[in-house]
A protein has these predicted regions:
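Hydrophobic transmembrane alpha-helices
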Residues: 1-73
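Membrane-water interface at transmembrane helix exits
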Residues: 15-19, 41, 82, 86, ...
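Helix-loop-helix junctions within the multi-pass membrane cores of secondary transporters/permeases
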Residues: 94-130
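Long, highly hydrophobic alpha-helical transmembrane signal-anchor segments
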Residues: 57-101
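Alpha-helix capping and helix-coil boundary motifs
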Residues: 1, 88-92, 130
Length: 130
């Protein structure tokens, strides 16, 4: 189980590294869910779950001030929990959508204070001439 957890961590790391490695669309559910399914030995089920979640997230594109739900956490956790429970894509969808929405809220609430602290530190450095 530890090896599976490490593989899931690596998949999540590469999915979240879009700003580091460039846009590769690995964060889309149609790519992530089969990778999670492959780790758990259920590639076919991962493909079906990925297609189901992709249909749900197909319009989740960041345009303007809209921030879409966190597809990465919803896909990975929804798929992993559904495979572990021995259920189908309906469970991955039922778990993935609320998880992605909750993660969006957590990212918004937790990242704003951190950015605020760094903004004040940068303002101080600008005033000091650094």
């Amino acid at each position: 189980m530890l090896v599976k957890t490490l593989f899931i961590f690596l998949i999540t790391f590469f999915a979240c590294s879009e700003f580091l490695l460039g846009t590769s669309l690995i964060q889309r559910p149609i790519i992530l869910a089969p990778l999670v399914g492959l780790v758990f030995g259920q590639l076919e089920l991962g493909i079906v779950m990925g297609a189901t979640l992709e249909l749900a997230f197909i319009g989740a594109v960041s345009i303007g001030a809209y921030i879409p739900p966190d597809m990465i956490s919803g896909t990975i956790l929804g798929t992993a929990l559904a495979i572990q429970a021995g259920t189908g894509p309906e469970t991955a969808l039922a778990l993935g959508l609320p998880i992605s929405t909750v993660m969006l809220a957590l990212n918004s609430v937790l990242s704003a204070p951190i950015m605020l602290v760094f903004t004040h530190l940068m303002d101080k450095d600008i005033e000091d001439g650094n």
